[in-house]
Amino acid sequence: MSDSHLTAFDKASKAGFIIALGIVYGDIGTSPLYTMQSLVENQGGVNQVSESFILGSISLIIWTLTLITTIKYVLIALKADNHHEGGIFSLFTLVRKMSPWLIIPAMIGGATLLSDGALTPAVTVTSAIEGLKAVPGLSHIYQNQTNVIITTLVILIVLFGIQRFGTGFIGKIFGPVMFIWFSFLGVSGFFNTLGHLEIFKAINPYYALHLLFSPENHRGIFILGSIFLATTGAEALYSDLGHVGRGNIYVSWPFVKMCIVLSYCGQAAWILANKHSGIELNPFFASVPSQLTVYVVILATLAAIIASQALISGSFTLVSEAMRLKIFPLFRVTYPGANLGQLYIPVINWILFAVTSCTVLYFRTSAHMEAAYGLAITITMLMTTILLNYYLIKEGVKPFLAHLVMTFFALVEFIFFWASAVKFMHGGYVVVILALAIVFVMFIWHAGTRIVFKYVKSLNLNDYKEQIKQLRDDVCFDLYQTNVVYLSNRMQDYMIDRSILYSILDKRPKRARVYWFVNVQVTDEPYTAKYKVDMMGTDYMVRVNLYLGFRMPQTVPRYLRTIVQDLMESGRLPKQEQEYTITPGRDVGDFRFVLIEERVSNARQLSNFERFIMQTKASIKHVTASPMRWFGLQYSEVTLEVVPLILSDVLKLPIKELVPVEDSEA
């Protein structure tokens, strides 16, 4: 990593500051919409809260933001960048060589992040639209929750519908809008606290600890389930590291934290001033002057949409990384934007839309959604803590110190998990079931890959080089193609899948001028694009290792085109002049890609469990993108050949010949 790149990544700028507000802080920045409402409603309403309860609640929020968001994520996790990229899968690629079992927390963390994220657009948009109940001219319409639901669904339909076109055209306004949003949070919160400056006593952690064990707290330790809502967006700070750079997060986080803390303090001051009024509105909107409410609702809705957009984009990135790490099925990925970071996965987009819409229809109100929200993200944070522990050790921190620091955070997060576990029976089971389904798919995909590696036999290419040369020169066979390309998942030195050599020599001898054996390896670095070539001492057999970062598209034909030109220019590969062509001077022949799919035969070597894994994986493949799409072969000549997973499992079955009886013997 060059010093210039490091400096650019770590330094801040005015533009970077604004961009960070629009990308990184959407989730945590919209938490004031519903966190205080959840605390008050779980206490029994505004008229049931006391000054000590409010002080304790604000103190818990402040210290939760400080311990988890500021110390763990901003000060520790942001250091764990994988070539400027963050997120749980980037962190996993940094430490995966330290222990094979680390794939487990990576899969669990990724699954829970995706599942809990499906709830975020529902909670934030519904909370914003419910603010219309406080608008004098619209309150009679939106007191009917059905109208809130309809409006929310319309916004979600538009939001998910525009994903296919890319969001670069509206992304430019995200930063300025969120700057206005955070400024409003800070200013309105500050003015609301002027009548109750004693609210700032909440900075003292004594009030937080006192509330946890106070009889005034009707929920005891389980109040932390609502407190945790204030910091659910902390994981996004780390996940979006690569989009904005570490320096911009360092500079923008103090501003964001100050604004949201002032907003919580302002809502708390309003509650203290109105606890005997009997008003049962969301404290966030109720604390705003009535003549400004409609504008605040519009601003809150925009902030909720931006938060949802950031989450949707983050989900696409998370899934694409999982696919390239071979722990998730392959789905079609498109790039509607001008850069690789703006990707779109249609299947994931509409699954998210379906889950989010069903969440709105099932829970109906933001209060009911809040009861289920946050449970899965506590698990994500715990999994990140486990991986961070290994990262610190890898970076030279003494194991005892690393274990001590991460055990502290794990203990804090486990307490939040325990406090949030009560949400399971109040709707939390929805995100848990979704997370388990995602983990199941990841496990099947990962285990299936390991089984294939276990049973597929490999042969040495050098042992068959002479046969392939004879086939190449044998005019008795028609020319199958000028260039035949085999994509292999497993190619260690000269060892290659037996099924590939079987396809060339046995199944139907494939005569070609050049045989290509291509293996794509996903690197720990996000944006690697390198290759290594071995001509094997010939001009007709080419071993190609493509080294692509886990965020790079695996469009093999485009890379291969460059490699062919390089080899011909260096004289390692003879030019393939074309007698008939509409392109004058064309010196590259035609290509055919052969894809080999291993399917489970009636293999006796497979255990029942392994058979279940492989059959389930085969079923999942029916709804996933084909390898042809994944490797960018839609416009190439492709042959798909199916072979049994275990070629050697062809046993002679006993059978007797019936000898016809002659008439004379009858």
UniProtKB/Swiss-Prot annotation:
The chain crosses the membrane at residues 16-36, 58-78, 100-120, 141-161, 165-185, 221-241, 253-273, 292-312, 343-363, 373-393, 399-419, 424-444. GO terms for cellular component: plasma membrane. Its main location: membrane. It is found in: Cell membrane. One of its GO terms (molecular function) is potassium ion transmembrane transporter activity. Keywords: Cell membrane, Ion transport, Membrane, Potassium, Potassium transport, Symport, Transmembrane, Transmembrane helix, Transport. The keyword Glycoprotein does not apply. The keyword NAD does not apply. It is a multi-pass membrane protein. It comes from the Bacteria. It catalyses: K(+)(in) + H(+)(in) = K(+)(out) + H(+)(out). Transport of potassium into the cell. Likely operates as a K(+):H(+) symporter. Belongs to the HAK/KUP transporter (TC 2.A.72) family. This is Probable potassium transport system protein Kup. It comes from Streptococcus pyogenes serotype M5 (strain Manfredo). The gene is kup.
